[in-house]
From Swiss-Prot:
Source taxonomy: Eukaryota, Rhodophyta, Bangiophyceae, Porphyridiales, Porphyridiaceae
Residues binding Mg(2+): K205, D207, E208
Protein name as it appears in the record: Ribulose bisphosphate carboxylase large chain
Quaternary structure (record): Heterohexadecamer of 8 large chains and 8 small chains.
Cofactor note: Binds 1 Mg(2+) ion per subunit.
Chief location: plastid
Keywords: Calvin cycle, Carbon dioxide fixation, Chloroplast, Lyase, Magnesium, Metal-binding, Monooxygenase, Oxidoreductase, Photorespiration, Photosynthesis, Plastid
Leftover remarks: The basic functional RuBisCO is composed of a large chain homodimer in a 'head-to-tail' conformation. In form I RuBisCO this homodimer is arranged in a barrel-like tetramer with the small subunits forming a tetrameric 'cap' on each end of the 'barrel'.
Modified residues (N6-carboxylysine): K205
Length: 488
């Protein structure tokens, strides 16, 4: 018998003899795999079903997120299947979490369409999350190779250009979300924008669910908001903005609203995460082409990012959104009302801002990541924060952040402008103390009290909110160190 025929017969007997072969034996498990610089790497937290071997579970994830199906198929012989099969190459037990494992998986770059978040996610978080062999599955982190990153636009504007456009350097930007988020008329909505900006804020913002409802249509909102922006800019001499939410039912509607926001002079527009990855990338390309800052509200993310054993970690969304091309994304506050472990939040901010990431297990960063000159994304901190926390916000979050005080501005007893002034004075006093070399974290409450002696709105705010905080145990915490929720 011809040798090539014998070889094919051997392959058939070993590889295709039975209809169902364990994934590990099909080539989806390779502990000796040599990782290539062009490989896409993913780390999954796996909870196998009782009786399922962790290695087989990892191999199954690799198979189902790349080329495999439930049975052997002959058409594998028509492809470079050894190349295209994802390889699970490492399985580690999760510290202090029995029955959970970290599975490291490598994917060849040719498995993914260039510049497409939708195609990347269709494999990585596709059918595999419903696979019966695993009780729960969570995507914890990814390494995106430089060769693949270079096929993405990255942030439309970026932190550096945004600061130049705002003529604002050396401090966090200040913002607020219009409240109540639903129900205001266009004229009253615009008045909120004007009062907040005149009081000292840099930005006002639409909330995630204000689009074009019967009580206020989008065009009316845009016109009244920009009237407020222009009047506040003229009176203050500062560059001001308002995030005009262009989220809509179709891409045609979103483009129409975005074009109108540009026509009326806005420097920034806004979209929601729920519009989907393709729509986000489309709007990012529009924003780059039209020289607009693009703000992304992460509406909906906690439906799949909050639980620790299933879904995906928000740091992965941060990476995808930096690739997709947004300029802002809400990334947590540590001290506010929303989920936020200090180390996890630090990892999110570093993912958005740093040009290069090293492995940092306490912050949940499992891979080294070179961002290949993609611009930085400005993190946004919002949700339950107020001026009495200013020293902690600066300490935790740094200068490259937008601090969004919604209720902490509009809930001020003396009015919106007074609330904005309280936040601006609190920020300026803390930065002055820091620049003077004082321990602004330890002395923060006293610094605020001293500043309030000459600022009535700040004193009123401190009296009202005092040291109110939201001290609940975070559901998403580090696996490698103990990180109690910030007690602030």
């Amino acid at each position: 018998m011809d040798q090539s025929v014998q070889e094919r017969t051997r392959i058939k007997n070993e590889r295709y003899e039975s209809g169902v072969i364990p994934y590990a034996k099909m080539g989806y498990w390779d502990p000796d795999y040599a990782i290539k610089a062009t490989d896409v790497l993913a780390l999954f937290r796996v909870t196998p079903q009782p009786g399922v071997d962790p290695v087989e579970a990892a191999a199954a994830i690799a198979g189902e997120s790349s080329t495999a199906t439930w049975t052997v198929v002959w058409t594998d012989l028509l492809t470079a299947c050894d190349l295209y099969r994802a390889k699970a190459y490492r399985v580690d037990p999760v510290p202090s979490s029995p029955d959970q494992y970290f599975a490291y998986i490598a994917y060849d770059i040719d498995l993914f369409e260039e510049g497409s978040i939708a195609n990347l996610t269709a494999s990585i978080i596709g059918n595999v999350f419903g696979f019966k062999a695993v009780k729960a599955l969570r995507l914890e982190d990814m390494r995106i190779p430089v060769a693949y990153l270079k096929t993405f636009q990255g942030p439309a504007t970026g932190v550096v250009v945004e600061r130049e456009r705002m003529n604002n350097f050396g401090r966090p930007l200040l913002g607020a979300t219009v409240k109540p988020k639903l129900g205001l008329s266009g004229k009253n909505y615009g008045r909120v924008v004007y009062e907040g900006l005149k009081g000292g804020l840099d930005f006002l913002k639409d909330d995630e669910n204000i689009n074009s409802q019967p009580f206020m249509r989008w065009r009316e909102r845009f016109l009244f908001c920009m009237e407020g922006v222009n009047r506040a800019s003229a009176s203050s001499g500062e560059v001001k903005g308002h995030y005009l939410n262009v989220t809509a039912a179709t891409m045609e509607d979103m483009y129409e609203r975005a074009e109108f926001s540009k026509e009326v002079g806005s420097i920034i527009c806004m979209i929601d995460l729920v519009i989907g990855y393709t729509a986000i990338q489309s709007m990012a390309k529009w924003a780059r082409k039209n020289d607009m800052i693009l703000h992304l509200h992460r509406a909906g993310n906690s439906t799949y990012s909050r639980q620790k054993n299933h879904g995906m970690n928000f740091r992965v969304i941060c990476k995808w959104m930096r690739m997709a091309g947004v300029d802002h994304i809400h990334a947590g506050t540590v001290v506010g009302k929303l989920e936020g472990d200090p180390l996890m939040i630090k990892g999110f901010y570093n993912t958005l801002l740093e040009p290069h990431l090293n492995i940092n297990l306490p912050e949940g960063l499992f891979f080294e990541q070179n961002w290949a000159s993609l611009r930085k994304v400005m993190p946004v901190a919002s949700g339950g924060i107020h001026c009495g926390q200013m020293h902690q916000l600066i300490d935790y979050l740094g200068d490259d952040v937008v601090l969004q005080f919604g209720g902490g501005t509009i809930g001020h007893p003396d009015g919106i402008q007074a609330g904005a002034t309280a936040n601006r004075v609190a920020l300026e006093s803390m930065l002055l103390a820091r620049n003077e070399g004082r321990d602004y974290v330890a002395q923060g409450p006293q610094i605020l009290r001293d500043a309030a002696k000459t600022c009535g709105p700040l004193q009123t705010a401190l009296d009202l909110w005092k040291d109110i905080s939201f001290n609940y145990t975070s559901t998403d915490t580090a696996d490698f160190v103990q990180t109690p929720t910030a007690n602030v």
